[in-house]
Structure formats: structure tokens, C-alpha cells
A protein has these predicted regions:
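An N-terminal domain-cap segment
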Residues: 1-27
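Hydrophobic packing residues in well-ordered alpha-helices of helical domains and bundles
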Residues: 1-4, 8, 30, 34, ...
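Short acidic/polar alpha-helix capping motifs at helix-coil junctions
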Residues: 8, 46-47, 84-85
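A structural signal for well-ordered alpha-helices, especially hydrophobic packing surfaces
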Residues: 12-15, 41, 45, 103-110
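General secondary-structure edge motif
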Residues: 13-14, 75, 79, 86, ...
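Short, contiguous alpha-helical
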Residues: 19-70, 111-139
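Acidic/histidine-rich alpha-helical segments that form the ligand environment
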Residues: 67-116, 135
Length: 139
């Protein structure tokens, strides 16, 4: 969890660069990527908090295993769900608000039961400790 919160601190330092863009890496600017990561944190935290541990389905996923082992998600292999895509126009205040919301969401996971989980469309059900690692790797 410390690593995830540190990433959010780093985002705050990078926020003034929100309009910067490197077309060799991505069509989207820095602000879009920060907001996307924050929206992912918010949506996953919400799903974890409301999950019912009794409905958890354990299933081994080689893809999840490799991503979490290598601490890297291959670029360009998946499309972000629409609810994790920021609006087309990104402002500094929007970026800072998303960082603050993501920090609150991440901190809410500190009191969540470790048996809670969220369902990833490719990796399946990920319990809280694994989900936190996934958030760090993704972010």
C-alpha cells in the first residue's frame, strides 16, 4: 500500500506537467494518464469495498501471475474500459481532484477485509492484497 500511496504523491508532483505529451509513447497527455490511473484506483476500490467474500471464485491465471511477477503490463494489449477513460478535455484542477479522490479510495482499502476482492475482466477475481499489487503495477 505504501508504494501505491507514493505513486499518488508522485502524480501530484507531475500534475503541473499535465499538458505534456510524447507521441512516441502515447497519443494522450500526462494528465490523461494520471486521471486514467486514478479512475482505475477509484473503481477498483469501490468494487472491493462492496464485494461479498463468499462469492469469491479462486482461479489461477497465467496472465495475472506474469504481470504481477514482472511488475509490468504489456503496452497496447488492452483497451481501457470507458468508465476509466477521462473526459476529452483535461484541466489541472480535474487532475488534482482525481488524485485526491484516488488517495481517499486507496486509504479506504486499509480497513477493508483481506478476503474482499474485485473481478478483473482478464485476470478474474483478485483478493485485496493481490488487487493492491495490481493497482501499483497498473499505476
Amino acid at each position: 500500500m505504501k508504494k501505491l500511496l507514493q505513486v499518488l504523491n508522485d502524480f501530484e508532483k507531475q500534475a503541473p506537467l499535465y499538458l505534456n505529451n510524447n507521441k512516441m509513447v502515447s497519443e494522450a497527455n500526462v494528465g490523461w494518464h494520471i486521471m486514467h490511473s486514478c479512475l482505475v484506483i477509484n473503481s477498483i476500490a469501490k468494487a472491493i469495498i462492496v464485494s461479498d467474500p463468499a462469492l469469491y471464485k479462486k482461479k489461477f491465471s497465467w496472465k495475472a501471475f506474469l504481470v504481477l511477477l514482472l511488475n509490468k503490463i504489456p503496452r497496447g494489449k488492452a483497451k481501457a474500459p470507458s468508465f476509466t477513460q477521462p473526459a476529452s478535455e483535461v484541466t489541472m484542477s480535474m487532475v488534482l481532484q482525481q488524485i485526491e479522490d484516488a488517495r481517499k479510495s486507496a486509504e479506504s482499502l486499509l480497513t477493508a477485509d483481506k478476503r474482499h476482492y474485485f473481478t478483473h475482466p482478464i485476470f478474474g477475481d483478485l483478493r485485496l492484497p493481490t488487487a493492491i499489487k495490481f493497482l501499483y503495477v497498473h499505476t
